[in-house]
Amino acid sequence: MQHNLAGKRAIVGGGSQGIGRAVAEALAAQGAEVLILARGREALALAAAALPTPLGQKHRWISVDNAQHEELSASVAAELLAWGDAHILINNTGGPKAGPLLEASPEAFMSAFTNHLIVNQRLAQLVVPGMLRAGYGRIVNVVSTSVKAPLHGLGVSNTVRAAVGNWSKTLATELAPVGITVNNVLPGATSTERLRAIIDGRAAHTKRSAQEIEDEMKAEVPMGRFADPSEIAAAVVFLASPEASYITGINIPVDGGRTPNL
């Protein structure tokens, strides 16, 4: 399906690789002008240069560290002054380190809440005034299926993702009267560097082969495979489009049917 995003400006977190990069590419292909955020300058520059420009868009990037949320806020605010109001915000941040809850330090929880919840909040505060001026606003949070059902071995991630889910639902309710939508896309196991790290970590912890772990994980998915990042991006782009104007406050699992609940 084609979605007309001509004239729309979109901010994409974690846009230099994985799901974030796929989302940035998909938005750009539909005509949006994209600002991607991540830490690595070289990877950002390469990713931005590779984004589609069917309408001659001029894409941008900012090297930022989510852990430094004050600096991130200042950098994005300055960019918006030069660029103009953003119409679309895609909150997307790599997940916390895997492991059981009782092995997680307080610092791990604080870092995860800063990187996900606090950064989402600061970015929303920056972009919503412009969305109101523009008469168009879409906030899409790329979270995890653990919003619906906790995942084994991802204690910190399960905890912070649930917080983001409730933050998103609350914000959706607050912004619904002004027509700004807020939704969550919940990726299942997706072929990214993070998934490879999880597989390798489980293999090392259980002294089994990475292939055995991978096969076991795929067997838990009714469709029998991992998602491609572009499949996650397709759901995000739809929620960011004009066609999704009456959809807000929902969670969309993109997981091949793995999530056990409705």
Predicted feature residues:
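Short C-terminal tail/terminal secondary-structure segment
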Residues: 1, 149, 236-237, 248-262
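Conserved glycine-rich cofactor-binding loop
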Residues: 9, 16-17
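Conserved glycine-rich Rossmann-like NAD(P)H-binding loop of the short-chain dehydrogenase/reductase
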Residues: 30-47
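Substrate-binding pocket helix/loop in short-chain dehydrogenase/reductase
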Residues: 100-102, 108-113, 139, 217
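Alpha-helical segment proximal to the catalytic Tyr-Lys
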Residues: 129, 173-174, 245
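Catalytic loop of short-chain dehydrogenase/reductase
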Residues: 140-164, 168-177, 189-190
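Short, small/polar-rich loop/turn modules that mediate ligand/substrate recognition or access, typified
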Residues: 176, 181, 247-249
